[in-house]
Amino acid sequence: MTVTEIFDNQPICIDNGSGFIKAGFAGDDIPKCLFPTCVGRIKHERVMPSSIQKDMFVGSEAQNLRGLLKIQRPIERGIIQNWSDMEEIWSYIYSDQQLNTLPEEHPLLLTEPPLANIRNKEKIAEYFYETLNVPALSFSLQPVLALYASARTTGIVLECGDGLTHSVPIYDGFSIPSAIQQEEIGGRDVTDYLQLQLRKSGHELVSSAEKEIVREIKEKCCYVASDFRSEIESWTEHKPQIHTYQLPDNQTITLGTECFSAPEVLFNPEMMGSEASGLHIQLFKSILLSDIDLRSTLYSNIVLSGGSTLLRGFGERFISELRAISGKKNQVKIYASPERMHNAWLGGSILASLSTFRRLLITSEEYKNDQNVIFRRRF
Protein backbone atom coordinates (compact mmCIF):
# COMPACT_ATOMS: atom_id res chain seq x y z
CA MET A 1 0.00 0.00 0.00
CA THR A 2 1.44 3.39 -1.03
CA VAL A 3 1.79 6.37 1.30
CA THR A 4 -0.99 8.19 -0.58
CA GLU A 5 -3.33 5.23 -0.20
CA ILE A 6 -2.56 5.01 3.52
CA PHE A 7 -3.43 8.66 4.02
CA ASP A 8 -6.66 8.14 2.10
CA ASN A 9 -7.68 5.45 4.60
CA GLN A 10 -9.94 6.34 7.50
CA PRO A 11 -7.87 7.49 10.48
CA ILE A 12 -8.34 5.65 13.75
CA CYS A 13 -9.14 7.55 16.95
CA ILE A 14 -8.19 6.15 20.38
CA ASP A 15 -9.22 7.78 23.66
CA ASN A 16 -7.10 6.36 26.49
CA GLY A 17 -9.15 6.71 29.68
CA SER A 18 -8.21 5.49 33.15
CA GLY A 19 -11.55 3.70 33.32
CA PHE A 20 -12.45 2.89 29.72
CA ILE A 21 -10.79 2.71 26.31
CA LYS A 22 -12.74 4.15 23.39
CA ALA A 23 -11.54 3.44 19.86
CA GLY A 24 -12.95 3.49 16.36
CA PHE A 25 -12.76 4.93 12.87
CA ALA A 26 -12.90 8.64 12.09
CA GLY A 27 -16.32 9.79 10.94
CA ASP A 28 -18.24 7.27 13.05
CA ASP A 29 -20.77 8.53 15.61
CA ILE A 30 -19.89 6.00 18.30
CA PRO A 31 -16.67 4.13 19.08
CA LYS A 32 -16.51 0.60 17.72
CA CYS A 33 -14.46 -0.43 20.77
CA LEU A 34 -15.59 0.48 24.26
CA PHE A 35 -14.19 -1.63 27.05
CA PRO A 36 -12.65 -1.26 30.54
CA THR A 37 -8.99 -0.26 30.63
CA CYS A 38 -7.94 -3.39 32.46
CA VAL A 39 -5.99 -6.60 32.11
CA GLY A 40 -6.70 -9.82 34.00
CA ARG A 41 -4.32 -12.69 34.69
CA ILE A 42 -5.18 -16.17 35.95
CA LYS A 43 -4.55 -16.23 39.71
CA HIS A 44 -5.14 -19.96 40.31
CA GLU A 45 -3.12 -23.04 39.39
CA ARG A 46 -4.37 -24.98 36.36
CA VAL A 47 -4.97 -28.61 37.47
CA MET A 48 -6.83 -30.06 34.47
CA PRO A 49 -7.58 -29.30 30.82
CA SER A 50 -9.92 -26.33 30.40
CA SER A 51 -11.73 -24.41 27.69
CA ILE A 52 -9.82 -21.36 28.94
CA GLN A 53 -6.54 -21.53 27.03
CA LYS A 54 -5.08 -18.08 27.69
CA ASP A 55 -3.46 -16.82 30.87
CA MET A 56 -4.21 -13.15 30.21
CA PHE A 57 -7.38 -11.33 29.16
CA VAL A 58 -8.14 -7.74 28.19
CA GLY A 59 -11.12 -5.45 28.80
CA SER A 60 -14.56 -7.05 28.78
CA GLU A 61 -13.05 -10.53 28.49
CA ALA A 62 -11.25 -9.93 31.77
CA GLN A 63 -14.44 -8.62 33.38
CA ASN A 64 -16.40 -11.70 32.33
CA LEU A 65 -13.84 -14.02 33.96
CA ARG A 66 -12.96 -11.79 36.90
CA GLY A 67 -13.59 -14.51 39.49
CA LEU A 68 -10.58 -16.40 38.11
CA LEU A 69 -8.39 -13.37 37.48
CA LYS A 70 -6.36 -10.72 39.18
CA ILE A 71 -7.61 -7.51 37.58
CA GLN A 72 -5.12 -4.69 37.06
CA ARG A 73 -5.63 -1.22 35.63
CA PRO A 74 -2.51 0.14 33.92
CA ILE A 75 -3.49 3.83 34.01
CA GLU A 76 -3.50 5.59 37.38
CA ARG A 77 -4.58 9.24 37.61
CA GLY A 78 -4.01 9.73 33.88
CA ILE A 79 -0.47 8.32 33.94
CA ILE A 80 0.44 4.92 32.51
CA GLN A 81 2.05 2.92 35.31
CA ASN A 82 2.21 -0.53 33.71
CA TRP A 83 3.51 -0.28 30.15
CA SER A 84 3.43 -3.98 29.27
CA ASP A 85 -0.27 -4.17 30.18
CA MET A 86 -1.06 -0.97 28.29
CA GLU A 87 0.71 -2.26 25.20
CA GLU A 88 -1.39 -5.42 25.38
CA ILE A 89 -4.52 -3.24 25.41
CA TRP A 90 -3.38 -1.18 22.41
CA SER A 91 -2.49 -4.31 20.47
CA TYR A 92 -5.90 -5.79 21.35
CA ILE A 93 -7.63 -2.74 19.83
CA TYR A 94 -6.32 -3.66 16.38
CA SER A 95 -7.06 -7.39 16.76
CA ASP A 96 -9.77 -9.27 14.86
CA GLN A 97 -11.91 -9.16 18.03
CA GLN A 98 -12.05 -5.35 17.89
CA LEU A 99 -11.15 -3.10 14.91
CA ASN A 100 -9.84 -6.01 12.84
CA THR A 101 -7.31 -3.93 10.94
CA LEU A 102 -3.57 -3.32 10.67
CA PRO A 103 -2.05 -0.33 12.51
CA GLU A 104 0.37 0.39 9.65
CA GLU A 105 -2.56 1.07 7.28
CA HIS A 106 -4.25 3.93 9.17
CA PRO A 107 -3.20 7.35 10.49
CA LEU A 108 -3.92 7.67 14.21
CA LEU A 109 -5.36 10.31 16.51
CA LEU A 110 -4.62 9.82 20.21
CA THR A 111 -6.31 11.86 22.91
CA GLU A 112 -4.33 13.12 25.87
CA PRO A 113 -5.18 14.94 29.11
CA PRO A 114 -4.10 18.54 29.68
CA LEU A 115 -0.81 18.82 31.58
CA ALA A 116 0.15 15.41 30.15
CA ASN A 117 3.25 13.70 31.51
CA ILE A 118 6.10 14.30 29.03
CA ARG A 119 7.73 10.90 29.58
CA ASN A 120 4.36 9.24 29.05
CA LYS A 121 3.94 10.98 25.72
CA GLU A 122 7.44 10.00 24.57
CA LYS A 123 6.85 6.32 25.34
CA ILE A 124 3.39 6.31 23.74
CA ALA A 125 4.81 7.76 20.52
CA GLU A 126 7.72 5.31 20.61
CA TYR A 127 5.38 2.32 20.92
CA PHE A 128 3.01 3.35 18.13
CA TYR A 129 5.74 4.41 15.69
CA GLU A 130 8.33 1.71 16.37
CA THR A 131 6.30 -1.32 17.50
CA LEU A 132 2.93 -0.94 15.77
CA ASN A 133 4.44 0.99 12.81
CA VAL A 134 1.65 3.54 12.49
CA PRO A 135 2.30 5.75 9.43
CA ALA A 136 1.31 9.03 11.11
CA LEU A 137 0.14 10.19 14.50
CA SER A 138 -1.45 13.23 16.12
CA PHE A 139 -2.13 14.06 19.78
CA SER A 140 -5.14 16.17 20.81
CA LEU A 141 -6.39 17.38 24.18
CA GLN A 142 -9.43 15.53 25.53
CA PRO A 143 -11.34 18.63 26.76
CA VAL A 144 -10.76 20.47 23.47
CA LEU A 145 -12.16 17.50 21.58
CA ALA A 146 -15.12 17.31 23.98
CA LEU A 147 -15.93 20.95 23.17
CA TYR A 148 -15.55 20.15 19.47
CA ALA A 149 -18.12 17.36 19.88
CA SER A 150 -20.58 19.88 21.33
CA ALA A 151 -20.30 21.97 18.11
CA ARG A 152 -18.64 24.86 19.96
CA THR A 153 -15.30 26.61 19.70
CA THR A 154 -15.73 28.66 22.88
CA GLY A 155 -16.61 27.38 26.33
CA ILE A 156 -15.25 25.72 29.43
CA VAL A 157 -15.10 21.94 29.67
CA LEU A 158 -15.35 20.00 32.91
CA GLU A 159 -13.86 16.61 32.06
CA CYS A 160 -14.46 14.23 34.97
CA GLY A 161 -13.11 10.77 34.30
CA ASP A 162 -12.13 7.82 36.43
CA GLY A 163 -8.92 9.18 37.91
CA LEU A 164 -8.68 12.88 37.06
CA THR A 165 -10.87 15.93 36.63
CA HIS A 166 -9.88 18.88 34.45
CA SER A 167 -11.52 22.22 33.87
CA VAL A 168 -10.26 23.79 30.67
CA PRO A 169 -11.41 27.18 29.34
CA ILE A 170 -11.26 27.47 25.55
CA TYR A 171 -11.86 30.61 23.54
CA ASP A 172 -12.30 30.53 19.76
CA GLY A 173 -10.53 27.18 19.59
CA PHE A 174 -7.60 28.17 21.83
CA SER A 175 -7.18 26.67 25.29
CA ILE A 176 -6.04 29.05 28.04
CA PRO A 177 -3.16 27.15 29.73
CA SER A 178 -2.82 29.51 32.69
CA ALA A 179 -6.45 28.86 33.68
CA ILE A 180 -6.44 25.05 33.42
CA GLN A 181 -7.23 23.31 36.70
CA GLN A 182 -6.54 19.65 37.46
CA GLU A 183 -7.57 17.63 40.50
CA GLU A 184 -6.84 14.00 41.31
CA ILE A 185 -10.44 13.10 41.89
CA GLY A 186 -12.92 11.16 39.79
CA GLY A 187 -15.10 8.09 39.50
CA ARG A 188 -12.48 5.83 41.08
CA ASP A 189 -12.69 7.86 44.30
CA VAL A 190 -16.46 7.40 44.37
CA THR A 191 -15.89 3.65 43.97
CA ASP A 192 -13.28 3.61 46.75
CA TYR A 193 -15.52 5.54 49.14
CA LEU A 194 -18.48 3.28 48.35
CA GLN A 195 -16.25 0.26 49.03
CA LEU A 196 -15.37 1.75 52.43
CA GLN A 197 -19.03 2.39 53.26
CA LEU A 198 -19.97 -1.16 52.28
CA ARG A 199 -17.19 -2.52 54.48
CA LYS A 200 -18.60 -0.57 57.42
CA SER A 201 -21.95 -2.19 56.68
CA GLY A 202 -20.36 -5.64 56.88
CA HIS A 203 -19.79 -6.31 53.18
CA GLU A 204 -16.15 -7.21 52.54
CA LEU A 205 -15.56 -6.63 48.83
CA VAL A 206 -11.79 -6.30 48.75
CA SER A 207 -10.29 -8.39 45.92
CA SER A 208 -9.62 -6.91 42.48
CA ALA A 209 -12.65 -8.77 41.10
CA GLU A 210 -14.87 -7.58 43.96
CA LYS A 211 -13.70 -4.01 43.37
CA GLU A 212 -15.24 -4.29 39.90
CA ILE A 213 -18.51 -5.37 41.55
CA VAL A 214 -18.40 -2.21 43.68
CA ARG A 215 -17.94 -0.21 40.49
CA GLU A 216 -21.08 -1.82 39.05
CA ILE A 217 -23.03 -1.06 42.24
CA LYS A 218 -21.96 2.57 41.91
CA GLU A 219 -23.14 2.78 38.30
CA LYS A 220 -26.52 1.14 38.99
CA CYS A 221 -27.47 2.50 42.43
CA CYS A 222 -25.62 5.73 43.20
CA TYR A 223 -26.88 9.26 42.62
CA VAL A 224 -25.89 12.80 43.54
CA ALA A 225 -28.11 14.43 46.17
CA SER A 226 -29.41 17.90 45.34
CA ASP A 227 -28.73 18.85 48.98
CA PHE A 228 -26.58 16.41 50.93
CA ARG A 229 -27.60 17.47 54.45
CA SER A 230 -31.30 17.50 53.61
CA GLU A 231 -30.97 14.06 52.01
CA ILE A 232 -29.28 12.68 55.15
CA GLU A 233 -31.99 14.14 57.39
CA SER A 234 -34.77 12.90 55.14
CA TRP A 235 -33.32 9.39 55.01
CA THR A 236 -32.77 9.30 58.78
CA GLU A 237 -36.36 10.32 59.49
CA HIS A 238 -38.27 8.51 56.76
CA LYS A 239 -35.88 6.07 55.01
CA PRO A 240 -37.63 6.98 51.76
CA GLN A 241 -35.63 4.85 49.36
CA ILE A 242 -33.69 1.63 49.83
CA HIS A 243 -31.74 0.11 46.95
CA THR A 244 -30.80 -3.52 46.62
CA TYR A 245 -28.10 -5.20 44.57
CA GLN A 246 -27.75 -8.92 43.98
CA LEU A 247 -24.20 -10.25 44.13
CA PRO A 248 -23.00 -13.04 41.81
CA ASP A 249 -23.43 -15.56 44.67
CA ASN A 250 -27.12 -14.51 44.95
CA GLN A 251 -26.61 -12.63 48.21
CA THR A 252 -28.43 -9.31 48.28
CA ILE A 253 -26.84 -6.08 49.48
CA THR A 254 -29.15 -3.42 50.86
CA LEU A 255 -28.01 0.16 50.30
CA GLY A 256 -29.24 3.25 52.07
CA THR A 257 -27.24 6.44 52.53
CA GLU A 258 -24.31 4.85 50.69
CA CYS A 259 -26.11 5.57 47.41
CA PHE A 260 -25.67 9.32 47.75
CA SER A 261 -22.83 9.66 50.27
CA ALA A 262 -20.28 8.03 47.92
CA PRO A 263 -20.81 10.48 44.99
CA GLU A 264 -20.74 13.36 47.47
CA VAL A 265 -16.93 13.13 47.51
CA LEU A 266 -16.93 14.80 44.07
CA PHE A 267 -18.27 17.97 45.69
CA ASN A 268 -16.76 17.53 49.16
CA PRO A 269 -13.46 15.62 48.75
CA GLU A 270 -12.57 16.29 52.40
CA MET A 271 -15.00 13.49 53.28
CA MET A 272 -12.30 11.03 52.20
CA GLY A 273 -9.40 13.06 53.56
CA SER A 274 -8.47 14.66 50.24
CA GLU A 275 -7.20 18.22 49.87
CA ALA A 276 -8.64 18.48 46.36
CA SER A 277 -11.26 21.10 45.55
CA GLY A 278 -14.84 20.15 44.79
CA LEU A 279 -15.61 20.05 41.08
CA HIS A 280 -17.72 23.21 41.16
CA ILE A 281 -14.94 25.11 42.93
CA GLN A 282 -12.38 23.79 40.47
CA LEU A 283 -14.34 25.11 37.49
CA PHE A 284 -15.02 28.40 39.31
CA LYS A 285 -11.26 28.87 39.80
CA SER A 286 -10.67 28.26 36.08
CA ILE A 287 -13.14 30.97 35.14
CA LEU A 288 -11.62 33.44 37.62
CA LEU A 289 -8.17 32.77 36.16
CA SER A 290 -9.46 33.62 32.68
CA ASP A 291 -9.54 37.16 31.32
CA ILE A 292 -12.37 39.21 32.81
CA ASP A 293 -13.83 39.88 29.34
CA LEU A 294 -14.25 36.14 28.71
CA ARG A 295 -15.91 35.12 31.96
CA SER A 296 -19.56 35.73 31.10
CA THR A 297 -19.15 33.75 27.87
CA LEU A 298 -17.54 30.87 29.76
CA TYR A 299 -20.30 30.82 32.39
CA SER A 300 -22.91 30.43 29.67
CA ASN A 301 -21.01 27.69 27.81
CA ILE A 302 -20.11 24.98 30.33
CA VAL A 303 -19.74 21.54 28.76
CA LEU A 304 -19.80 18.42 30.95
CA SER A 305 -17.75 15.48 29.74
CA GLY A 306 -16.56 12.14 31.09
CA GLY A 307 -18.32 9.09 32.51
CA SER A 308 -18.41 10.34 36.10
CA THR A 309 -20.73 13.20 35.12
CA LEU A 310 -23.35 10.59 34.14
CA LEU A 311 -24.22 9.96 37.79
CA ARG A 312 -27.91 10.69 38.29
CA GLY A 313 -28.44 14.22 39.59
CA PHE A 314 -24.89 15.38 38.81
CA GLY A 315 -25.84 18.19 36.41
CA GLU A 316 -28.54 19.65 38.67
CA ARG A 317 -26.26 19.65 41.71
CA PHE A 318 -23.33 21.09 39.79
CA ILE A 319 -25.27 24.04 38.41
CA SER A 320 -26.82 24.70 41.83
CA GLU A 321 -23.42 24.76 43.55
CA LEU A 322 -21.86 26.92 40.84
CA ARG A 323 -24.67 29.47 40.93
CA ALA A 324 -24.30 29.70 44.70
CA ILE A 325 -20.63 30.74 44.48
CA SER A 326 -20.63 32.69 41.20
CA GLY A 327 -23.31 35.23 42.06
CA LYS A 328 -26.72 36.00 40.58
CA LYS A 329 -25.41 38.30 37.84
CA ASN A 330 -23.76 35.47 35.94
CA GLN A 331 -25.97 33.46 33.60
CA VAL A 332 -24.84 29.87 34.15
CA LYS A 333 -25.68 27.36 31.41
CA ILE A 334 -24.59 23.74 31.25
CA TYR A 335 -24.57 21.48 28.22
CA ALA A 336 -24.56 17.77 28.96
CA SER A 337 -24.84 15.30 26.09
CA PRO A 338 -26.36 11.90 26.97
CA GLU A 339 -23.30 10.37 25.25
CA ARG A 340 -20.77 12.44 27.19
CA MET A 341 -18.90 9.37 28.38
CA HIS A 342 -17.21 9.37 24.97
CA ASN A 343 -17.37 13.09 24.12
CA ALA A 344 -13.60 13.30 23.67
CA TRP A 345 -13.61 10.32 21.31
CA LEU A 346 -16.48 11.79 19.27
CA GLY A 347 -14.64 15.10 18.96
CA GLY A 348 -11.58 13.19 17.79
CA SER A 349 -13.68 11.28 15.27
CA ILE A 350 -15.00 14.56 13.85
CA LEU A 351 -11.57 16.19 13.75
CA ALA A 352 -9.84 13.20 12.14
CA SER A 353 -12.51 13.02 9.41
CA LEU A 354 -11.73 16.57 8.20
CA SER A 355 -9.47 17.12 5.20
CA THR A 356 -7.39 19.56 7.29
CA PHE A 357 -6.48 16.77 9.74
CA ARG A 358 -3.51 15.82 7.55
CA ARG A 359 -1.78 19.04 8.56
CA LEU A 360 -1.84 17.93 12.20
CA LEU A 361 -0.27 14.53 11.56
CA ILE A 362 3.34 13.73 12.35
CA THR A 363 4.57 11.09 9.92
CA SER A 364 6.83 8.24 10.94
CA GLU A 365 9.58 9.77 8.77
CA GLU A 366 9.35 13.08 10.62
CA TYR A 367 9.49 11.19 13.92
CA LYS A 368 12.58 9.23 12.86
CA ASN A 369 14.35 12.46 11.93
CA ASP A 370 13.46 14.24 15.17
CA GLN A 371 11.57 12.56 18.01
CA ASN A 372 10.92 15.90 19.73
CA VAL A 373 8.58 16.86 16.89
CA ILE A 374 5.70 15.35 18.92
CA PHE A 375 6.03 18.23 21.41
CA ARG A 376 6.08 21.01 18.84
CA ARG A 377 2.83 20.33 17.05
CA ARG A 378 -0.27 21.01 19.06
CA PHE A 379 -3.98 20.94 18.31
UniProtKB/Swiss-Prot annotation:
SUPFAM superfamilies: Actin-like ATPase domain (SSF53067)
Subcellular localization, as worded in the UniProt entry: Cytoplasm, Cytoskeleton
SMART domains named among the record's database cross-references: ACTIN (SM00268)
Domain of life, source organism: Eukaryota
Transmembrane portions of the chain: none
The family this protein is said to belong to: Belongs to the actin family. ARP1 subfamily.
Name assigned to this protein: Centractin
Organism, as annotated: Schizosaccharomyces pombe (strain 972 / ATCC 24843)
GN (gene name): arp1
